[in-house]
Swiss-Prot record:
<dbReference type="InterPro" id="IPR017441">
    <property type="entry name" value="Protein_kinase_ATP_BS"/>
</dbReference>
<feature type="lipid moiety-binding region" description="N-myristoyl glycine">
    <location>
        <position position="2"/>
    </location>
</feature>
<dbReference type="InterPro" id="IPR008271">
    <property type="entry name" value="Ser/Thr_kinase_AS"/>
</dbReference>
<dbReference type="InterPro" id="IPR011009">
    <property type="entry name" value="Kinase-like_dom_sf"/>
</dbReference>
<protein>
    <recommendedName>
        <fullName>Serine/threonine-protein kinase 32A</fullName>
        <ecNumber>2.7.11.1</ecNumber>
    </recommendedName>
</protein>
<keyword id="KW-0547">Nucleotide-binding</keyword>
<feature type="active site" description="Proton acceptor">
    <location>
        <position position="146"/>
    </location>
</feature>
<dbReference type="GO" id="GO:0004674">
    <property type="term" value="F:protein serine/threonine kinase activity"/>
</dbReference>
<feature type="binding site">
    <location>
        <position position="52"/>
    </location>
    <ligand>
        <name>ATP</name>
    </ligand>
</feature>
<dbReference type="GO" id="GO:0005886">
    <property type="term" value="C:plasma membrane"/>
</dbReference>
<keyword id="KW-0472">Membrane</keyword>
<feature type="compositionally biased region" description="Acidic residues">
    <location>
        <begin position="388"/>
        <end position="398"/>
    </location>
</feature>
<keyword id="KW-0808">Transferase</keyword>
<dbReference type="InterPro" id="IPR000719">
    <property type="entry name" value="Prot_kinase_dom"/>
</dbReference>
<dbReference type="GO" id="GO:0005524">
    <property type="term" value="F:ATP binding"/>
</dbReference>
<feature type="region of interest" description="Disordered">
    <location>
        <begin position="379"/>
        <end position="398"/>
    </location>
</feature>
<keyword id="KW-1003">Cell membrane</keyword>
Length: 398
């Protein structure tokens, strides 16, 4: 499936925007909200990434372009050890691309489906790492709104990383959100009763953390909610159902989960300090957590892809527009567009042209390089000013 077979890495202009030709496509590994995901290698640095690609025409037809743009906007401003971070975004005539951290440990949903039994100490560390990620998002005024095992990836050492910001929301200060979005079994009670006057805030992500932690420990969720369950039934369930906790779990873990699964958002644990100050976490070295120096109790199997192998078959056999045939397809498409003059084709092209114009190109390497250069220039300028001040002082003393 590789796009480049040459042993000699091509030379790219440093000032050129990163594009599809800068990567070697290795294999498909999954599906995102609006597209598919594959492993890629950057030709110049040989670094490995995950590349998510979204077909523009499908996004236009499903009215999903704005969601993609919003996700890009949010991810460009984020960087944290327990997030899946964006490195590049670019486009061609057919697709929009997001190149992110490659995490080969699989998502937590995959491991649950493989009947992995997560021990309490493992889940305890997961809670700490995810709490640090949520605290960072909160500091950036971001609500994820879709925290669940499917959107938590493991790296090769077993540390967790939050991904998929497709329905995340930016929350201006002194405001609350009223729009309903998320995956029902993980949505907080206040999201189902949200009104314009009340709304909801960051606490919804901490409820999702509680549901996820419970599910990892028990293999099922605390409430029997499905995507087909009506909002009315869910509200009634929150008011009447009693969450049970196995006797094998420590009382400290049960107490923590109860704080996260508190129906009243004002009383729910919803800050990192709530977790840090909880007696159960008194033995936790939080600097070591942030620096990933604590060894998780579950480490994904090395030497294998922790994902559904059918994704590769879909890409190679079933996919109507496989990525490895992109160049030929784009050349053919250009010829067909020149021949076609139907009003429907013209309208679609107008929308695609708008996407092309408004798409946000991003290069984290360049952003970091520019920042480091500015810092170096400032340091040089400061040194120069200090030297001049010292010389002026010496002259004044003469």
């Amino acid at each position: 499936m590789g796009a480049n077979t040459s042993s000699k890495a091509p030379v790219f202009d440093e000032n050129e925007d990163v594009n599809f030709d800068h990567f070697e496509i290795l294999r498909a590994i999954g599906k995102g909200s609006f597209g598919k995901v594959c492993i890629v290698r950057k030709n110049d640095t040989k670094k490995m990434y995950a590349m998510k690609y979204m077909n523009k025409q499908k996004c236009v037809e499903r009215n999903e372009v704005r969601n993609v743009f919003k996700e890009l906007q949010i991810m460009q401003g984020l960087e944290h050890p327990f997030l899946v971070n964006l490195w590049y975004s670019f486009q061609d005539e057919e697709d929009m691309f997001m190149v992110v951290d490659l995490l080969l440990g699989g998502d937590l949903r995959y491991h649950l489906q493989q009947n992995v039994h997560f021990q309490e100490d493992t889940v305890k560390l997961f809670i700490c790492e995810l709490a640090m990620a949520l605290d960072y998002l909160q500091s950036q005024r971001i609500i994820h709104r879709d925290m669940k095992p499917d959107n938590i990836l493991l790296d090769e050492h077993g540390h967790v990383h939050i991904t998929d910001f497709n329905i995340a929301a930016m929350l201006p200060k002194e405001t609350r959100i009223t729009t309903v979005a998320g995956t029902k079994p993980y949505m907080a009670p206040e999201m189902f009763t949200s009104r314009k006057e009340t709304g909801y805030s960051f606490a919804v992500d901490w409820w999702s953390l509680g549901v996820t932690a419970y599910e990892l420990l028990r293999g099922r969720r605390p409430y029997h909610i499905r995507s087909s369950t009506s909002s009315k039934e869910i509200v009634n369930m929150f008011e009447t159902a009693i969450v049970t906790y196995p006797s094998a779990w420590s009382q400290e873990m049960v107490s923590l989960l109860k704080k996260l699964l508190e129906p009243n958002p004002d009383q729910r644990f919803s800050h990192l300090t709530d977790i840090q100050n909880f007696p159960y976490m008194s033995d936790m070295n939080w600097d070591a957590v942030l620096q990933k120096r604590l060894i998780p109790g579950f480490i994904p199997t090395k030497g294998r892809l922790n994902c559904d192998p059918t994704f590769e078959l879909e890409e190679m056999i079933l996919e109507s527009k496989p990525l490895h045939k992109k160049k030929k397809r784009l050349a053919k498409r250009e010829k067909e567009m020149k021949k076609s003059d139907s009003s429907q084709t013209c309208l679609l092209q107008e929308h695609l042209d708008a996407v092309q114009k408004e798409f946000i190109i991003f290069n984290r390497e360049k952003v970091k390089s520019d920042f480091n250069q500015r810092q170096a220039n400032l340091a040089l300028e400061q040194t120069k000013n200090n030297t001049e001040e010292e010389e002026d002082g010496q002259n004044n003393n003469l």
